[in-house]
């Protein structure tokens, strides 16, 4: 799904967590069932239309087990919810703040690279 999202959002410096980019509608449905949230509804279509980015936050030791569902808008965390739309643990909130700063740096770097390419083409 959307390769440019993979390179932007997937890598993280976290020791305890993994960010998973869902690959299919079934991934969304499974996340919604396991975390008892609404991500299995219309979020798949919204993501395909680039209206939002959904990521699944996992504990590294349990990468296949639903933990938190995250909605991003660029480098901004729109929402990060645990099971049954509960507030995630404080350490997750801290991680998400660090993660959003990492994403902001990547976005700035991409923009600088695009600008450099435009300048090259113009010359």
Tell where the protein language model's regions lie, with residue ranges:
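Catalytic-core elements of nucleic-acid end-processing and repair enzymes
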Residues: 1-123
